[in-house]
């Protein structure tokens, strides 16, 4: 009798294990995990749209771009970019397709990001965020239903080109003019996010701006030297970033219970700056110059046919592959932070948590200002800077 009971218990245990593996755990009220990833913004998220939009050949379609994977596919990296890794972590089996290319598979999301994109103005051979949103709306009816869109993640990185252009065109702008411009940019960002929300999107991942003054191309153009960043651009980026969290909090709190606005904010600024100042902790040995390019910081002309650019021997030791874009190694790190880091990096929840958060539930946690830490972005090659946690 005891033997029969043991056999029965064993059979029940096997059935339970098989049931658990066959039916993945889901959050109450959520029948399935996230179904797609949509990205918007500039060259950091461009999956190949620039190649379709421009009438000229783009360097990103040719070697040494894609060097790490022997696949120059129009992405501004030596290999994959952050959304590629994030999609893998989200169990999306397909690469995020460039939406502007014909005959691509957009069944699990699409990239609308284009190199040179801005929030304001009319960029040449590029698109504003508003134009990208309109393109999404044009494609929506034929490709994605409302339930699909509501459960998908919408990821945005935009604004860098606005501030780079403003600084170049207004070198003597005072604090008042800078503040007014930041307000214009962030107000436009809010309007464009609202337009996406009105189209049915509900889950947003907003990436703050990088420390723009520490980009190798900026250091090179403004002759900062090897150990200094251009603080005017960093200040503009910080002013911009400070407005993002409160803006999204307001949008979430004001959204109707029938269509909750859900979001998270990735502190990209400090994620980059930490690796710039504590480079050896992350096994980056060059953070103030590019792997590919020419000039004082090897930051210009990577891949251009009329430029004899230098190319480093080992790109994984560089934080930046070209003058504006991070190496694949760094991009993968950022994707890991987005997907699984704590609230020191991405808040009020990480992307893994956002994907399973019930789409019909209002947010109960919100963005809060980080603990102040005053550290200037100088001496970038040093590993002794203080004031930042390792993330």
Curated annotation (Swiss-Prot):
GO BP annotation list: lipid catabolic process
Cellular compartments per GO CC: extracellular region; plant-type vacuole; plasmodesma; vacuolar membrane
Enzyme class: hydrolase
Pfam families: Lipase_GDSL
Superkingdom as given in the UniProt entry: Eukaryota
GO molecular function, one term: hydrolase activity, acting on ester bonds
CDD domains: SGNH_plant_lipase_like
Region (Disordered): 372-391
Positions annotated as active site in the UniProt record: 43, 322, 325
Record has Lipid metabolism as a keyword: yes
EC number: 3.1.1.-
Alphabetical list of InterPro entries matching this protein: GDSL, GLIP1-5/GLL25, SGNH_hydro_sf, SGNH_plant_lipase-like
Subcellular location: Secreted
Hydrolase found in the keyword field: yes
Annotated signal peptide: 1-29
Glycosylation sites: 105, 165, 288
Entry keyword set: Glycoprotein, Hydrolase, Lipid degradation, Lipid metabolism, Secreted, Signal
Homology family: Belongs to the 'GDSL' lipolytic enzyme family.
Subunit structure: Component of the PYK10 complex, at least composed of PYK10/BGLU23, BGLU21, BGLU22, JAL22, JAL23, PBP1/JAL30, PBP2/JAL31, JAL32, JAL33, JAL34, JAL35, GLL22 and GLL23.
PANTHER family: GDSL-LIKE LIPASE/ACYLHYDROLASE, INACTIVE GDSL ESTERASE_LIPASE-LIKE PROTEIN 25
Protein name: GDSL esterase/lipase 22
């Amino acid at each position: 009798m005891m033997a029969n009971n043991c056999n029965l218990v064993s059979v029940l245990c096997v059935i339970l294990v098989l049931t658990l593996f066959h039916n993945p755990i889901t959050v109450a009220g959520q029948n399935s995990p996230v179904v797609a990833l949509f990205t918007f913004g500039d060259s950091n998220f461009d999956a190949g749209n620039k190649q379709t939009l421009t009438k000229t050949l783009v360097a990103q379609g040719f070697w040494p771009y894609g060097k790490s994977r022997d696949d120059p596919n129009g992405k501004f990296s030596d290999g994959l970019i952050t959304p590629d890794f994030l999609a893998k972590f989200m169990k999306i089996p397909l690469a995020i397709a460039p939406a502007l290319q014909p005959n691509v598979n957009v069944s699990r999301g699409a990239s609308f990001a284009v190199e040179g994109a801005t929030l304001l103005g009319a960029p040449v051979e590029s698109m504003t965020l508003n134009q990208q949103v309109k393109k999404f709306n044009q494609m929506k009816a034929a490709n994605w239903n409302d339930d699909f869109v509501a459960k998908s993640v919408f990821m945005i990185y935009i604004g860098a080109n606005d501030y780079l252009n403003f600084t170049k065109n207004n070198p003597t702008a005072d604090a008042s003019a800078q503040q007014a411009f930041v307000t214009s940019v962030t107000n436009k960002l809010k309007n464009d996010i609202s337009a996406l929300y009105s189209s049915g999107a509900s889950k947003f991942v907003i990436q703050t701006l990088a420390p723009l003054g520490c980009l190798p191309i900026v250091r090179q153009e403004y002759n900062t030297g090897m150990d200094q960043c251009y603080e005017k651009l960093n200040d503009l980026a910080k002013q911009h970033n400070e407005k993002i969290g409160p803006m999204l909090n307001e949008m979430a709190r004001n959204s109707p219970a029938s269509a909750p606005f859900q979001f998270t904010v990735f502190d990209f600024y400090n994620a980059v700056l930490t690796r710039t100042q504590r480079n050896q902790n992350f096994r980056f040995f060059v953070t103030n110059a590019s792997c590919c390019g020419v000039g004082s910081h090897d930051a210009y002309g990577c891949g251009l046919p009329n430029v004899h650019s230098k190319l480093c021997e080992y790109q994984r030791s560089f934080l930046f592959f070209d003058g504006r874009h991070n190496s694949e190694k760094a991009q993968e790190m950022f994707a890991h932070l987005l997907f699984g880091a704590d609230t020191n990096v991405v808040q009020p929840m990480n992307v893994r948590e956002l994907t399973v958060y019930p789409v019909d539930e209002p947010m109960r946690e919100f963005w809060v200002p980080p603990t102040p830490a005053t550290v200037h972005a100088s001496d970038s090659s040093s590993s002794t800077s203080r004031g930042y946690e390792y993330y």
